[in-house]
Swiss-Prot record:
Keywords of this entry: Disulfide bond, Secreted, Signal
GO terms for biological process, alphabetical: adipose tissue development; body fluid secretion; cGMP-mediated signaling; energy homeostasis; glucose homeostasis; multicellular organism growth; negative regulation of blood pressure; reduction of food intake in response to dietary excess
Lineage: Eukaryota, Metazoa, Chordata, Craniata, Vertebrata
Disulfide bonds: C62-C75, C95-C103, C98-C106
Protein name as it appears in the record: Guanylate cyclase activator 2B
Length: 106
């Protein structure tokens, strides 16, 4: 294999890896990291706009049509609020996502 073929193979692997995205698994739910980031944005907007806040059993974000599809099944859970909180915590912890090679268990 020549040097240019090796570089092409490495580049292809990097592109494929980044295209797959990062997934978070928690209590039977599997969601994309990008979806959790979108969840944070939606919740921040709802906190700043009292008209978007609902009083119900579900977290307010469950009523938002912009909620990513992979997060919508969480709203059917009785523990939706605590699940969203856990997902946000995991998404901000580099060791949970195995981004930092110094973390153990990755």
């Amino acid at each position: 294999m020549s040097g240019s073929q090796l570089w092409a193979a490495v580049l292809l692997l990097l592109v494929l890896q980044s295209a797959q995205g990062v997934y978070i698994k928690y209590h039977g739910f599997q969601v994309q990291l990008e979806s959790v980031k979108k969840l944070n944005e939606l919740e921040e907007k709802q906190m700043s706009d009292p008209q978007q806040q609902k009083s119900g059993l579900l977290p307010d974000v469950c009523y938002n049509p912009a909620l990513p599809l992979d997060l919508q099944p969480v709203c059917a859970s009785q523990e939706a609020a605590s699940t969203f909180k856990a997902l946000r915590t995991i998404a901000t912890d580099e060791c949970e996502l195995c981004i930092n090679v110094a973390c153990t268990g990755c």
